[in-house]
């Protein structure tokens, strides 16, 4: 009875426009129904048996075993086998910054939660600190240190998240400055190019395939093209880089707090 009622509620919630958008993405009504049902019921935590360790699942090869494994891999590549580094890169960074989005919209102006306090206490350590500081100077006329001294923490958060600044709230995670080095920071995408050159190249060529979301494809292509030559020259390899889009049929519906489908202003 409850299941039939749930199906009835789903049916009356979906408009003709909803059904059209769902069909265009290759998603069935039953899939949407199942997604909303799971959102309503919640996602149970997995019950862990124990922490992973060398006694439970983690391998700890000896130095001799490591050397043998490396030799076997190098021999495999030397035989002319094609190696492709596959990188799922369609994830958006919005979830990474959900706490900072909440702070930007909060009814208080200074860091209050433990997360907010830690974020600003360690902001100097982030790989994107220099770029963020430059955006703050450009948009606010002050650097990060001065903004913090003046209590303008939200200005820093907004310059990190919004399009006027770094736009990190909307970028794919692969294009965020992720690691800091003495000479310069690198995005996650750049690190994959480096890794491909170091351990996945064969006969002087490194093959890399990125999967990205449709909306990020042009920017991702541009950023890859911008960095490809630099790392090809640095590591002495020729890159063969391809990109594909994640299928819309893998999308999950967004829901409001009352479990009704979330819609933009245009429906």
What is the role of each PLM region?
Residues 22, 44-267:
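Domain-scale recognition of functional cores that engage charged ligands
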Residues 1-12:
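Short, Lys/Arg-enriched N-terminal segments with co-localized hydrophobic residues
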Residues 14-54:
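N-terminal regions that are enriched for targeting/export leaders
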């Amino acid at each position: 009875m409850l299941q039939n009622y749930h199906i009835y509620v789903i049916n009356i919630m979906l408009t003709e426009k909803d059904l059209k958008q769902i069909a265009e993405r290759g998603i069935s009504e039953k899939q949407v129904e199942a997604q909303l049902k799971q959102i309503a019921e919640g996602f149970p935590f997995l019950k862990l048996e124990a922490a992973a360790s060398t006694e439970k699942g983690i391998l700890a090869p000896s130095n001799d075993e490591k050397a043998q494994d490396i030799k076997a891999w190098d021999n495999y590549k030397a035989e002319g086998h094609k190696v492709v580094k596959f990188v799922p890169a369609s994830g958006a960074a919005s979830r990474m910054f959900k706490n900072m989005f909440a702070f930007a919209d909060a009814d208080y102006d200074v860091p209050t939660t433990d997360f907010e306090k830690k974020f600003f206490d360690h902001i100097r350590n982030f790989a994107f600190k220099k770029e963020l500081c430059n955006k703050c100077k450009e948009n606010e006329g002050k650097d990060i240190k001065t903004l913090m001294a003046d209590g303008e923490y939200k200005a820093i958060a907004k310059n990190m998240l919004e399009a006027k600044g770094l736009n990190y709230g909307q970028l794919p995670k692969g294009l965020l400055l992720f690691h800091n080095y003495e000479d310069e920071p690198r995005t996650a995408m750049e690190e994959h190019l480096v890794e491909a050159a170091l351990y996945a190249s064969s006969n002087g060529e490194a093959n890399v395939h990125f999967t990205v979301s449709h909306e990020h494809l042009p920017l991702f292509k541009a950023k890859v093209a911008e960095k490809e030559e630099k790392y090809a020259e640095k590591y002495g390899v020729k890159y063969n880089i391809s990109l594909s889009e994640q299928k819309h049929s893998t999308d999950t519906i967004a829901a409001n707090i009352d479990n009704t489908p979330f819609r933009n202003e245009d429906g």
